[in-house]
A protein has these predicted regions:
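Alpha-helical substrate-recognition element adjacent to the catalytic core
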Residues: 14-134
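C-terminal cap/substrate-recognition subdomain and adjoining C-terminal extension
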Residues: 84-231
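N-terminal amphipathic/basic-hydrophobic helices that include classical n-h-c signal peptides
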Residues: 1-16
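Short, basic/polar N-terminal leader/transit segment immediately after the initiator methionine
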Residues: 3-4, 19-22, 214
Length: 231
């Protein structure tokens, strides 16, 4: 009996080390930020085309980001913040994060997006850590971008993974774009969520239903767990 309790305690500790890494736009958020911001300057078609090419891996992601932000130069900082504050959270994201956190999981978000949208998201979803880029403002006007997260999102993620002592076999990644695929190198379970074909080809499994809480079923099956699931 004592041996059984000890083993159960060890198993519980191991399970508590599990980590989910999410992409943000198109995964935790149900919109792409810059194309919506571009509507303020009637440049949504131009910005969305560059965004799509970056997501699909057809252009250099960093250059595409710099080009998109440059096209929006001069936008008022208050407008940028207002748009960020009103980005819709993905269906099922709150439920998924709530259940994961209640079960002892850590949650990280790695985004090519920006601090002014990630601060809000971190609070609302109780994320343990976020990595993202920063928009640069000068006298209240959009000036440029500071790139902290490039096309290899695994680089910043590895820093916190090492700090937390996470193991690859205990990590899940949920992503949708070509600029996310290197995250699959550092995880046990890679989920392509409503993703580009390139991402689907490299993922462990895919989820097409627009409900992020359905990843819980996938996680349960893969790790033989019994996390709470939604109907």
């Amino acid at each position: 009996m004592v041996t059984t309790l000890i083993l159960l305690g060890i198993f519980s500790q191991i399970r508590n080390l599990l980590l989910v890494i999410f992409d943000v736009e198109g995964v935790l958020l149900d919109e792409e930020y810059l194309p919506i911001l571009a509507e303020k300057l009637n440049k949504e078609d131009e910005i969305w085309e560059i965004t799509k090419q970056g997501i699909q891996g057809k252009i250099n992601w960093e250059e595409g980001l710099i080009t998109r932000v440059a096209a929006l130069k001069g936008l008022d900082e208050k407008i940028c913040q207002e748009v960020a504050d009103n980005l819709p959270i993905m269906t099922g994201a709150k439920e998924a994060c709530r259940i994961l956190k209640a079960s002892g999981w850590k949650i990280m978000a790695v985004s090519g997006g920006f601090t002014l949208m990630m601060d809000r998201l971190q609070k609302e979803l109780d994320l343990d850590y976020v990595y993202c880029n920063d928009l640069i403002f000068n006298n209240g006007k959009l000036e440029g971008v500071k790139i902290n997260v490039d096309s290899d999102k695994s680089k910043p993620a590895k820093i916190k993974i090492a700090e937390w002592g996470e193991k690859k076999e205990d990590i899940v990644c949920v992503v949708d774009g070509a600029n996310d695929i290197k995250l699959f190198d550092i995880c046990e379970l890679g989920i392509a969520y409503r993703a580009q074909d390139l991402v689907k080809d490299l993922a462990t499994t895919t989820l097409e239903e627009k409900d992020l809480s359905k990843i819980l079923n996938i996680i349960n099956k893969h790790f033989n767990l019994k996390l709470e699931t939604t109907v």
